[in-house]
Amino acid sequence: MKKILAIAMMLAATAAYAQQEIRLYDGVAPGSEGVQDNERVQRGPDGRITQISGVVTPSVTVFLPEESKATGTAVILCAGGGLMAHSWGSDVINMASWLNERGIAAIGLKYRTRVMGGQRPAMGGTGMRLSATVTEFDKIKNANASPDQSGADDENTLNAVNDALRAMEIVREHAGEWHIDPAKIGYLGFSAGGGVGLGAIVKSDAQHMPAFMATIYGPSLIDMTVPENAPKLFIATRGDHHNVAAGLVSLYFVWKQAGANAEMHLYDDGTGPFGPDDVGNTSGTWRESFYRWLTFNGF
């Protein structure tokens, strides 16, 4: 009986939160040939997914608002997890529900993560490691706050970036069906997921360029080149988040120096990640600030 109830809870949770999952590629994802699929999913007591790791087969999960509420805006959610896992429960499921309540479509991107056990070649490099406080943001060149400062782009990062580009293609292909305005699609990334979205901007052509980019304590993991048609940028982080705050201050300056639109929220209430449940801290208001920023900019 307990087993039946557990299965029923899982099915109910899936029906309520995951409307549709679409694989990004037909067959093996480019760059993952020969890599063993070892995906692992963790669930909470209510059956909802909390974390996903070992992702080799990337996909998007579509969360749509009620049609009567739809604003036409869509947010591609890039979860954090250090490129080793996805914090799917907090960064995708919870965030998607919050966005849907406001008429915004949410697309959870399950990009490829680092596969453990030596199944992928390690990146080369000099072993140089980044260490910067927020006042040392000038240490960071081209807004690249990758922990490895060898100058070589990480294969795992580039695979995830390519998945983000493919996700943008899919959302635009289905825009009419999902009641989405193709000109109102952007990325929202947390931690490493912010780096994935920012990397997609660097690699984007006109077809893939988002209308906006929001990064929550997630600096760039590759050299930033701000395009002429740069999307509007929203940044939120804690000022004492080592390396991260410095990387995001550097990103803000790079964006503004290029003449692009950027807004930054630098909170003085802690040293690491934060969420909407931090009600006693100023950083707990970031979602409301993000939503106001979206509406102010016509999204």
Question: Language-model features: where?
Answer:
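Short amphipathic alpha-helix adjacent to the substrate-entry channel of hydrolases
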Residues: 89-108, 253
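The feature captures the conserved acid-bearing segment of alpha/beta-hydrolase catalytic domains
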Residues: 206-267
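C-terminal catalytic histidine-bearing segment of alpha/beta-hydrolase fold enzymes
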Residues: 258-299
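Short beta-strand element of the alpha/beta-hydrolase
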Residues: 71-80
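Primarily recognizes the serine-hydrolase "nucleophile elbow" in alpha/beta-hydrolase
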Residues: 154-230
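Active-site glycine-rich loops that stabilize anionic/oxyanionic intermediates
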Residues: 79-84, 239-241
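N-terminal cap/lid segment of alpha/beta-hydrolase-fold proteins
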Residues: 19-69, 101
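Alpha/beta-hydrolase active-site loop
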Residues: 122-176, 288-289
